[in-house]
Amino acid sequence: MLVSREGHCLNDLLYRWRIGALSGDIAGIVSNHPDFGPLATAYGVPYHHLPVSAESRPQQEAALLDLVDRYDFGLVVLARYMQVLSARLCAQLPGRIISIHHSFLPSFKGARLYQQAYDRGVKLIGATAHYVTADLDEGPIMSRRPPGWTTR
């Protein structure tokens, strides 16, 4: 899984994995920030900090590909990973990267989706899981879900 600073999606996926509600294995967590090392350790999942900047992006993505190969990541999940992946990286992992996006795509693409929804007067947003392509938030949609709120 790839994650940046916001940990709610990562926490939810790790919890679901721990209780058996998420099939498969979590082979590792990669982040461009150092924040989630202790959380990964608590779940017994390898953690890799790969900082990224505009200048270091090619080296960071090469290191990411090395981890994908070394740990045999079958699928790369972007769990609030707030970096745009290069076309080159997307081409090297076709159909193997999915993103969890906090809106009903194709509406409200990119990082400022809550502001976009607010500006348009939208009262309810949900989440979309989609395959990642070189075009931001344009990949084939796997699933859309409304918020899982309850009144309990």
Language-model segments: what does each one mean?
Residues 1-152:
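One-carbon transfer enzymes
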